[in-house]
UniProtKB/Swiss-Prot annotation:
The gene is tmk. GO terms for biological process: dTDP biosynthetic process; dTTP biosynthetic process; dUDP biosynthetic process. This is Thymidylate kinase. The lineage of its organism: Bacteria, Pseudomonadati, Pseudomonadota, Gammaproteobacteria, Pseudomonadales. NCBIfam families: DTMP_kinase. ATP binds at residues 10-17. It comes from Pseudomonas syringae pv. syringae (strain B728a).
Length: 210
């Protein structure tokens, strides 16, 4: 039995983690085996890389270094967590995956999408998410929510232009491959967002049984 790989994407303050947990609870209530994970991170080694990527520092990190660290963490995450869970037939719900790399390192940092695609193929082979939920909201709302959480990480400290590019890249990717992506209006109340997820649940269950 092959599992199902679902990723949750979106900019800062979009509520991905909260809604990932909600979706997991709904799937588990239907008897589905669910594994929750996140990127960067998901394993002890990858979590240490996450700390390098997110911690504010006086030493500037080059965009290429950032990109390579992201894919190094992803390689470990795939080998240790994601591929084994899919092989067991589980549903993997991952907070961010390679779409975030295209959005943040491609859109935000301005790195070539061809360079990202080459690393994607090297690290992932043919593995791609079965479904990606993009939690979209205006940049100013997302940044306001992120600021309300407290101390900002290295990415959250970026300026408005960076996050405009991140959001645009997510939306471009969703438009280019509508069969894989579902857009969720994350500017709504949490109750309304979760009502939207409830409408997607039958489709997720069908894919899982598929």
């Amino acid at each position: 039995m092959t599992g199902l790989f679902i990723t949750l994407e979106g900019p800062e303050g979009a509520g991905k983690s909260t809604n990932r947990d909600y979706l997991a609870a709904q799937l588990r209530a239907q008897g589905v085996q669910v594994l929750l994970t996140r990127e960067p991170g998901g394993t002890p080694l990858a979590e240490r890389v996450r700390e390098l990527l997110l911690a504010p520092s006086d030493e500037a990190m080059s965009a290429d270094t950032e990109l390579l660290l992201v894919f190094a963490a992803r390689a470990q995450h795939l080998a240790e967590v994601i591929r084994p869970a899919l092989a067991r037939g589980e549903v993997v719900l991952c907070d961010r995956f390679t779409d975030a790399t295209y959005a943040y390192q491609g859109g935000g940092r301005g790195l070539s999408h061809q360079r990202i695609a080459a690393l994607e193929q090297f690290v992932q082979g043919d593995l791609r998410p079965d479904l990606t939920l993009v939690f979209d909201l205006p940049v100013e709302i997302g940044l306001s929510r992120a600021a309300a959480r407290g101390r900002l990480d290295r990415f959250e400290q970026e300026g408005r232009a960076f996050f405009d590019a991140v959001r645009s890249t997510y939306l471009e990717r969703a438009r280019a491959e509508p069969a894989r992506y579902r857009l969720v209006d994350a500017a709504q109340t949490l109750a309304d967002v979760q009502a939207c997820l409830d409408t997607l649940l039958p489709q997720l269950l069908e894919l899982q049984r598929g």
